[in-house]
Curated annotation (Swiss-Prot):
Pfam families linked: Ribosomal_L34
Identification of the protein by name: Large ribosomal subunit protein bL34
Gene: rpmH
Lineage: Bacteria, Bacillati, Bacillota, Clostridia, Eubacteriales
Region (Disordered) location: 1-44
Organism field: Syntrophomonas wolfei subsp. wolfei (strain DSM 2245B / Goettingen)
PROSITE patterns recorded: RIBOSOMAL_L34
Membrane-spanning ranges: none
Length: 44
């Protein structure tokens, strides 16, 4: 059985990146919550 995590930078950015988060209301909420919590990094 192959491992489930096969890292790809393009896929990572497209699915979890800042612009992907900003594209939907839910994603913007995620960023707001991470900013409020004081996360060092707010998106991939």
């Amino acid at each position: 059985m192959k491992r489930t995590f096969q890292p790809k930078n393009r896929q990572r950015k497209r699915e979890h990146g800042f612009r992907a988060r900003m594209a939907s209301a839910g994603g913007r909420k995620v960023l707001a919550n991470r900013r409020k919590k004081g996360r060092k990094s707010i998106s991939a």
